[in-house]
């Protein structure tokens, strides 16, 4: 598997299942093998991505996992389009913290033309101030006209996750289909936006279904694969549904994704702090990307803590110049001490008077 991975070739479905079903005793050997592939294509670099939540909550979609879904009782912050100055401040905090890519996200089915123009203005402003920083946009479903407009404004990438396998999708969401999502990925590709599309592991899918979606993403030629692990928000249908997720379970999935997408950006995304916990440094041996700071509606690790983890592992933040300006309180993050069903809700950054976490 390793030799094929070094040539940029994917593993087979059978090999992928073997990794997922391997014993915990084999984990370190699997990580070491996947790590050779990761370092071959990405050396010791780690790409830091930074999320900016432009519009939070009140989404008309009914995705079962989502704290922003229709009918969600999760006690998250809800706000319409954020003040441009607050967006600017959050972006500056993320870049100062070492972010290589800024991800601008808004809840909802998809943007109106007015919404697209609003976000395009933010993209142009960011690119004018920081031409070397990549911009990823995530606004839901878009057609060719809107995708082309976002690309013309200067966006580099667009995130639209598959989330789970086609065969499992109806159990997770009823307001749109898996096909709708993958059709959107093709729209992005046609219009020159780098497609970022990944999964949420731990939503009741079988091993076979997890393999199906990962291989389908390869078939669609996505450039970046964020791997999230279910955050079981209270007030959502999947609350309490993450008891089976262990650090070893997560690491096997990350390793399998690396072997399936050897030369793609693989990101340990939401849920890594809560589910991989003290074994997060091992994840860096497999993935080449993480999020810096907070997520859309939940808190992430303190920026300084993640940067220290990267340095301690012998890795280098990609694109960071000199000493990043980050918070110094590396003990402020407490997710590792929380039970798996207690999701730390975000109460800082956009929507509050508290500075962003970066």
From Swiss-Prot:
Cofactor binding mode and count: Binds 1 [4Fe-4S] cluster. The cluster is coordinated with 3 cysteines and an exchangeable S-adenosyl-L-methionine. Binds 1 [2Fe-2S] cluster. The cluster is coordinated with 3 cysteines and 1 arginine.
Ranges for domain Radical SAM core: 44-272
InterPro entries assigned: Aldolase_TIM (IPR013785), BATS_dom (IPR010722), Biotin_synth/BioAB (IPR002684), Biotin_synthase (IPR024177), Elp3/MiaA/NifB-like_rSAM (IPR006638), rSAM (IPR007197)
Superkingdom of origin: Bacteria
Residues given in the record as [2Fe-2S] cluster binding sites: 103, 136, 196, 267
Catalytic activity from the UniProt record: (4R,5S)-dethiobiotin + (sulfur carrier)-SH + 2 reduced [2Fe-2S]-[ferredoxin] + 2 S-adenosyl-L-methionine = (sulfur carrier)-H + biotin + 2 5'-deoxyadenosine + 2 L-methionine + 2 oxidized [2Fe-2S]-[ferredoxin]
SUPFAM superfamilies, alphabetized: Radical SAM enzymes (SSF102114)
PROSITE patterns: RADICAL_SAM (PS51918)
Swiss-Prot/TrEMBL cofactor(s): [4Fe-4S] cluster; [2Fe-2S] cluster
Pfam families in alphabetical order: BATS (PF06968), Radical_SAM (PF04055)
Pathway(s) served: Cofactor biosynthesis; biotin biosynthesis; biotin from 7,8-diaminononanoate: step 2/2
Keyword annotations of the record: 2Fe-2S, 4Fe-4S, Biotin biosynthesis, Iron, Iron-sulfur, Metal-binding, S-adenosyl-L-methionine, Transferase
A single GO molecular function term of this UniProt record: iron ion binding
EC number per UniProt: 2.8.1.6
Family in the record: Belongs to the radical SAM superfamily. Biotin synthase family.
Its job: Catalyzes the conversion of dethiobiotin (DTB) to biotin by the insertion of a sulfur atom into dethiobiotin via a radical-based mechanism.
Protein name: Biotin synthase
Gene: bioB
């Amino acid at each position: 598997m390793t030799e094929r991975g070094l040539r940029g070739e994917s593993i087979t479905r059978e090999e992928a299942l073997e990794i997922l079903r391997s014993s915990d005793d084999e984990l370190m050997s699997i990580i070491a093998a996947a790590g050779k592939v990761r370092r071959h294509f990405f050396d010791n670099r780690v790409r830091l991505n930074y999320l900016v939540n432009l519009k939070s909550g009140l989404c008309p979609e009914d995705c079962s996992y989502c704290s922003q879904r229709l009918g969600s009782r999760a006690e998250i912050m809800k706000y319409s389009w954020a003040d441009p100055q607050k967006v600017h401040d959050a972006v500056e905090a993320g870049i100062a913290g070492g972010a290589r890519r800024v991800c601008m996200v808004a809840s909802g089915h998809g943007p109106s033309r007015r919404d697209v123009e609003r976000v395009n203005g933010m993209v142009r402003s960011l690119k004018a101030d920081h031409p070397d920083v990549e911009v990823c946009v995530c606004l839901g479903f878009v057609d060719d006209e809107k995708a082309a407009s976002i690309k013309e404004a200067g966006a580099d990438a667009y995130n639209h996750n598959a989330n789970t396998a086609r065969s499992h999708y109806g159990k997770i969401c009823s307001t749109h289909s898996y096909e709708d999502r993958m059709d959107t990925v093709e729209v992005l590709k046609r219009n020159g936006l780098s497609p970022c599309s990944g999964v949420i592991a731990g939503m009741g899918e079988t091993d076979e279904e997890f393999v199906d979606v990962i291989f389908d993403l390869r078939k669609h030629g996505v450039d970046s694969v964020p791997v999230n692990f279910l955050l079981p928000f209270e007030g959502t249908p999947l609350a309490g549904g993450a008891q089976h997720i262990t650090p070893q379970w997560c690491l096997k999935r990350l390793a399998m994704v690396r072997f399936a997408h050897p030369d793609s950006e693989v990101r340990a995304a939401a849920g890594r702090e809560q589910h991989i916990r003290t074994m997060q440094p091992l994840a860096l041996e497999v993935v080449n990307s993480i999020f810096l700071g907070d997520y859309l509606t939940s808190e992430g690790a303190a920026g300084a803590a993640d940067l220290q983890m990267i340095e301690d592992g012998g890795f280098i933040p990609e694109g960071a110049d000199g000493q990043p300006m980050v918070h110094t309180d590396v003990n402020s993050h407490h997710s590792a001490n929380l039970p798996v069903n207690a999701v730390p809700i975000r109460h800082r950054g956009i929507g509050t008077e508290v500075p962003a976490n970066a």
